[in-house]
Structure formats: structure tokens, C-alpha cells
């Protein structure tokens, strides 16, 4: 099929192009309670073809881009027609000219990690066993679950001779936990792992069952006021994603962010801790065939790397790093238990928690929180929290070993 696409590109007189081939083998398992409802194997194979069109507009060089998806079942004529349409579309979708990444070539890179040691079917089986091994809370149960175990081959080719290939395995899915008494409550959770970390899923389910049982007895008695807010897991990650977004070339070039290398992102330090954050490479190459590696993005509260794909990086005059999907933040200097010695509001579940990376404001409506007033812990629901990362970053505390952060924020009871 690669040869068919290349021949069609030549016939369509498309000189600049990139092909991204994806071949996936997926084992899917679906459960209702503990009963396996359905099991299936799914194989998909597709080619995402990007075509580029260079031209001038008002005397300035432009580069247009368009893309189409091709599957092996399509005929040579169908492929040619799609590519001609993409070429035509690219001539109307121009941006100021930018250079594409340099040529990359390598031997196929085998999948690494513990997931590569077992089949997709076996991985799905083990994660299912781990998920239901935790389903032993007398107050709550796993209502339903879905597990998807994938083995993916990615190959990227370009007109400049680029030809890289790598394999990657991962497991993701979702489950719903339910508690029926004294109030019927259901809570949705998702998960994703790139190693055979069954213990992590088991712990996640155990926590989810405990929290849904607490949600069923939670009371809407959160007073309005200002609290030491503790966030963990996905909620903490959502807040910290602000720093990843603001240091991206896609935010800096249009002027949405004024950050540059060396910018202090915590200019008003009080009793908080300096951030140290790292972009984590989950694959060896980006979709543009840019080599990916771990990069320090925030070091001691200052920007160390601006990051992004080829186009925005070219406009800024920086090295293209590729687009990252994961990051880590170094642990803080206090333990989670120390963090909870002072009065706090530990919000563990929201109906919708969001971070606005343009303004730095974040917040959401509370579904479940633990309120400690200095003497006792109450399980509460209702109300909302909102705040600005810019206003509280100087007092942010991070803990170890759990991924949690504490800031001081106002809460409002509706």
C-alpha cells in the first residue's frame, strides 16, 4: 500500500508529503458486574497522508497543509482522487512558510517494558483480574468495566527520505463504581498504562470504591469561605498542566503567553515550593518524525524549555521538540500526612474540574470532599471551588510520595 500511495503522490505532482502508518492489534473485554459480557479482537490498519503546497501570497512564501486517511481496501484510483483533493485543499489552507523536520531514519524500534513481554490478550486478562481483585468493598461494587489492550506499529515516511518505525504497547479502559445505600451513586473512572502495572489499577479501584461509598453518605454542608485546598491525581495534573501549556510554542508565538526561557513562573514566592517539571517522551518519534526525549520544562520555578511542533517552533526560531502528551512533577518536601495536619478541604471528585490555560483560573463543582476543621473530618458534597494559579503559585506545596498539591482558595456553597 505504501508503494500505491507513493505512486499516487507522484502522479498528483505532490512534491512534499508525509505518511503516518498505524497498524493496531487490540484485545477488548467488556464486563457487566463481574460477568464478561463481550470479548473481541480488533485489527485496524490505516495511513494518514499529509500533503503540503508551497506558493506565494502578496509576495510572501506560504505553505499549505491538508491530510487524508487511506485504508488498504481502497483502490489505486480512489487513493489518487483523495490525494488530488487534498492537494487542492492545501492550496487554500496556507500559513507563513515554515520548514519541516530534518530527515530521520532508523531500524524498527521494538516495544519496551513489561507489556511487551505478553500478548495483548494476556495483558487484558491480567488487568481484568487486577480490577476485580479489588472489588471486595461491602459498601460498593464495580458496576461495569471496559479494557482495551493495544499493540501498535507506527511508521513515518517523508519525501525527504525520512523512514522511522517503532512499536508500542499500552492498556487503557474505564470502569463505573456504584454504591446503592443510603443514596444510589455511580462514579465513572478511566485509566491508562504503558506497562504491566496491575497493582496501580488495583489500588485505583480500591480508592474508587471507598470514595463512592463516602459519596453516598456525604452531606451538603460545606460552608462558604477560604480553605487550604488539597488536590491529587487527575485534578492536581489538571492544575499543573497550566505550566505545560504556557511554555508551549503554540501559546508563545501568537502572544497568548509571554513566557520565554528564564521566565520566573512563580514570581511572588511566599511559603510555597519551587516547581520542577519534566516533559516525558512516551514514544521515540512525534507524528512529524521529530526525535522525542525527556526534557526539563520548568526548573526551580523558571522556564527551561519552550516546546512544540515544527511550524510554531520555526516561527519562534527554536528547536522543534515535538508535541508531548505526558509530564511529571518532582515530589515536594512534606509528606501527605504532614500536609493534612492543618485544616484543609481535600476535594477528590468534581462534576467538572477545569483549568483555563489562557487566564490561569481553575475550579469546579464538588462531588466529594473531606473537610478537616482542626478537630474532625467531615465528608461533604456540593458547593464549588475556584481560584487563580497565578495568585496562589507562590504558596503552593507539593507532597511525597503521593501526587498532591495544596493551595489556599475560596469555596462557595451554592
Where are the language model's segments positioned?
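Short, compositionally biased leader-like segments
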Residues: 2-26, 243-278, 323-344
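Acidic low-complexity segments
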Residues: 5-7, 15-28, 76-166, 206-234
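Structured beta-strand/loop patches that form or line metal/cofactor-binding pockets in enzymes
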Residues: 15-48, 144-164, 343-366
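N-terminal alpha-helical targeting/anchoring segments
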Residues: 25-88
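Extended amphipathic alpha-helical scaffolds
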Residues: 30, 124-203, 250-276
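Short beta-strand elements
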Residues: 45-59, 164-194, 297-299, 366-373
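Short His/Asp/Glu-rich catalytic/ion-coordination signatures at enzyme active sites or charged loops
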Residues: 63-74, 103-120, 174-178, 183-202
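Dual-mode signal for accessory low-complexity, basic/Gly-rich regions
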Residues: 263-414
Amino acid at each position: 500500500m505504501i508503494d500505491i500511495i507513493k505512486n499516487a503522490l507522484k502522479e498528483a505532482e505532490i512534491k512534499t508529503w508525509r505518511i503516518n502508518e498505524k497498524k493496531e492489534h487490540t484485545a477488548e473485554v467488556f464486563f457487566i458486574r463481574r460477568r464478561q459480557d463481550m470479548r473481541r479482537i480488533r485489527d485496524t490498519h490505516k495511513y494518514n497522508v499529509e500533503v503540503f503546497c508551497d506558493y506565494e501570497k502578496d509576495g510572501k512564501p506560504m505553505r499549505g497543509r491538508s491530510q487524508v486517511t487511506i485504508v488498504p481496501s481502497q483502490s489505486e484510483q480512489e487513493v489518487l482522487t483523495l490525494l488530488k483533493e487534498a492537494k487542492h485543499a492545501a492550496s487554500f489552507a496556507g500559513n507563513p512558510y515554515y520548514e519541516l523536520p530534518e530527515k530521520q531514519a532508523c531500524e524498527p524500534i521494538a516495544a519496551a517494558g513489561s507489556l511487551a513481554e505478553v500478548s495483548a490478550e494476556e495483558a487484558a486478562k491480567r488487568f481484568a483480574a487486577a480490577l476485580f481483585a479489588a472489588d471486595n468493598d461491602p459498601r460498593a461494587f464495580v458496576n461495569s468495566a471496559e479494557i482495551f489492550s493495544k499493540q501498535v506499529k507506527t511508521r513515518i515516511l517523508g519525501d525527504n527520505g525520512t523512514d522511522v518505525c517503532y512499536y508500542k504497547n499500552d492498556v487503557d479502559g474505564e470502569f463505573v463504581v456504584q454504591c446503592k445505600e443510603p443514596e444510589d451513586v455511580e462514579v465513572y473512572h478511566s485509566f491508562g498504562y504503558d506497562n504491566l502495572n496491575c497493582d496501580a489499577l488495583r489500588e485505583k479501584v480500591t480508592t474508587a470504591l471507598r470514595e463512592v461509598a463516602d459519596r453516598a453518605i456525604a452531606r451538603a454542608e460545606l460552608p462558604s469561605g477560604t480553605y487550604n485546598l488539597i488536590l491529587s491525581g487527575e485534578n492536581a495534573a489538571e492544575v499543573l498542566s497550566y505550566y505545560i501549556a504556557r511554555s508551549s510554542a503554540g501559546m508563545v508565538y501568537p502572544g497568548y503567553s509571554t513566557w520565554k526561557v528564564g521566565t520566573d513562573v512563580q514570581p511572588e514566592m511566599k511559603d510555597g515550593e519551587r516547581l520542577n517539571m519534566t516533559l516525558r517522551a512516551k514514544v521515540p518519534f512525534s507524528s512529524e518524525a521529530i526525535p522525542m526525549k525527556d526534557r526539563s520544562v520548568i526548573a526551580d520555578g523558571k522556564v527551561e524549555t519552550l516546546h512544540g511542533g515544527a511550524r510554531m517552533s520555526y516561527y519562534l526560531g527554536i528547536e522543534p521538540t515535538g508535541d508531548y502528551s505526558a509530564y511529571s512533577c518532582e515530589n515536594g518536601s512534606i509528606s501527605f500526612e504532614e500536609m493534612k495536619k492543618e485544616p484543609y478541604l481535600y476535594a477528590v471528585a468534581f462534576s467538572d474540574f477545569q483549568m483555563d490555560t489562557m487566564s490561569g483560573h481553575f475550579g469546579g463543582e464538588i462531588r466529594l470532599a473531606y473537610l478537616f476543621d482542626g478537630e474532625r473530618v467531615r465528608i461533604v458534597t456540593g458547593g464549588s471551588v475556584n481560584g487563580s494559579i497565578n495568585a496562589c503559585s507562590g504558596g503552593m506545596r507539593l507532597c511525597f510520595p503521593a501526587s498532591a498539591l495544596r493551595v489556599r482558595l475560596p469555596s462557595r456553597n451554592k
